[in-house]
């Protein structure tokens, strides 16, 4: 029963702890790391708009988030993603006053109507033309033919003389 006399592996005792100087160095290293991270976050985030690093705005660093070397994205794609990130970042910066509450009454929207000139215009009143719509087919063909004949006379200065061989 020698196993009971020896200390179990999980318990700790004073001799296991590192000397005080080593722990102090670790504390200093952690402090420096934390300060660097905070500085990076402050540089990357616009104050007051973004709270977390996930919402970070694109800062203009061209090497950002693109993989270099073999297997990396092509320049075209990289450029497009860069543009998209800029666009999304710009959307994040839009203040809330530009997203009005749709349930509240939007000033000026009730007054938006067609001008009287447009209302009087016959194009906007479909009932006026229904009788005139049935145009005589021969009339239409005569008008169309005459317009085309006139065009043929002037032509394209003789470039297409063989376009209409019968006439």
Curated annotation (Swiss-Prot):
Coiled-coil regions listed in the entry: 21-45
Highest taxon above the source species: Viruses
GO molecular function, one term: RNA binding
Biased composition (Polar residues): 158-167
GO biological process, one term: mRNA transport
Locus of motif Nuclear export signal: 106-115
Compartments where located: Host nucleus, Host nucleolus; Host cytoplasm
A Gene Ontology term for the protein's cellular component: host cell nucleolus
Keywords: Coiled coil, Host cytoplasm, Host nucleus, mRNA transport, RNA-binding, Transport
Coiled coil among keywords: yes
Chain span(s) of sequence motif Nuclear localization signal and RNA-binding (RRE): 75-92
Keyword Coiled coil applies: yes
InterPro entries xref list: Rev_lentivir (IPR016400)
Region (Disordered): 1-20, 33-75, 142-167
Domain statement: The RNA-binding motif binds to the RRE present in incompletely spliced viral pre-mRNAs. This region also contains the NLS which mediates nuclear localization. These overlapping functions prevent Rev bound to RRE from undesirable return to the nucleus. When Rev binds the RRE, the NLS becomes masked while the NES remains accessible.
Function in brief: Escorts unspliced or incompletely spliced viral pre-mRNAs (late transcripts) out of the nucleus of infected cells. These pre-mRNAs carry a recognition sequence called Rev responsive element (RRE) located in the env gene, that is not present in fully spliced viral mRNAs (early transcripts). This function is essential since most viral proteins are translated from unspliced or partially spliced pre-mRNAs which cannot exit the nucleus by the pathway used by fully processed cellular mRNAs.
Quaternary structure and partners: Homomultimer; when bound to the RRE. Multimeric assembly is essential for activity.
Protein's name according to its UniProt entry: Protein Rev
Organism: Maedi visna virus (strain 1514)
